[in-house]
């Protein structure tokens, strides 16, 4: 009888406790994966950003080098933001874009960007995005609409003012950010993109991306 009651209590407790969501890795950063990612060259850019795979003691990484270039790597992936709303990014800027005004069209380049995308219409132009950036000139926490479209918000998660040529890990609550910046209650995102771009400034940037994933906390 005692054993039966214990079993009932255990089952009841299991039903009450929330289910722990496992982290969701977005990129593997392997040569094989690199071949499958969607490459999108920015319209008007003279060159494509060069992306190669490397590794260190913490695993694989993506190295991006842009010389008067702009192209991104995209991946369609569904992420349930009710379970795993937090994006985690580890990145490093080796060569930044010192002196540019990132909130203007002429200076709208970033050594590091990770776009989180939500489809909100029939065409890509209707999509809304939060653009998490590694800034060369602005402080962490600064944000503004892209000078090209209000449907994309630039949000500074890291800056070379504080971290130049060193690895840094940051996180952000994507669900809260879509509500804050777009007034959207988003339960699921549709894609992630990475880009290092210098097509507006005509400069050179070198950045490394590693271990991008979503988690519950």
What are these regions (language model features)?
Residues 29, 192, 210-214:
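Extracellular beta-strand elements of beta-rich domains used
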Residues 90-96, 119, 175:
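Solvent-exposed strand-to-loop "edge" motifs in beta-rich extracellular domains
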Residues 21-44:
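Extracellular carbohydrate-recognition regions
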Residues 109-114, 150-151, 156-160, 164-204:
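Extracellular beta-strand ligand-recognition surfaces/modules
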Residues 76-87, 161-164, 185:
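Extracellular/lumenal carbohydrate-interaction signature centered on repeated Trp-anchored short motifs
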Residues 51-72:
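Short carbohydrate-recognition loop motifs
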Residues 107-152:
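Extracellular/luminal beta-rich ligand-recognition
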Residues 7-16:
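Bacterial N-terminal signal peptides
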């Amino acid at each position: 009888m005692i054993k039966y009651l214990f079993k009932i209590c255990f089952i009841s407790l299991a039903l009450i406790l929330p289910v722990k969501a496992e982290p969701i890795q977005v990129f593997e950063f392997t040569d094989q994966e690199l071949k499958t990612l969607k490459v999108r060259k920015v319209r008007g850019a003279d060159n494509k950003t060069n992306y190669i795979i490397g590794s260190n003691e913490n695993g694989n990484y993506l190295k991006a080098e842009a010389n008067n270039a702009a192209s991104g790597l995209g991946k369609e992936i569904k992420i349930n933001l009710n379970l795993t709303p937090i994006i985690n990014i580890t990145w490093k800027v080796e060569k930044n874009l010192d002196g540019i005004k990132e909130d203007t069209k002429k200076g709208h380049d970033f050594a590091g960007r990770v776009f989180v995308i939500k489809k909100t219409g029939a065409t890509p132009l209707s999509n809304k995005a939060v653009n998490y950036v590694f800034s060369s000139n602005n402080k962490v926490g600064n944000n503004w609409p892209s000078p090209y479209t209000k449907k994309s918000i630039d949000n500074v998660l890291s800056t070379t003012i504080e971290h130049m040529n060193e690895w840094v890990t940051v996180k952000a609550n994507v669900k809260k950010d879509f509500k804050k910046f777009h007034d959207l209650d988003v339960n699921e995102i549709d894609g992630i993109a990475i880009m290092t771009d210098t097509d507006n400034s005509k400069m050179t940037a070198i950045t490394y991306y590693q271990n991008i994933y979503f988690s519950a906390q």
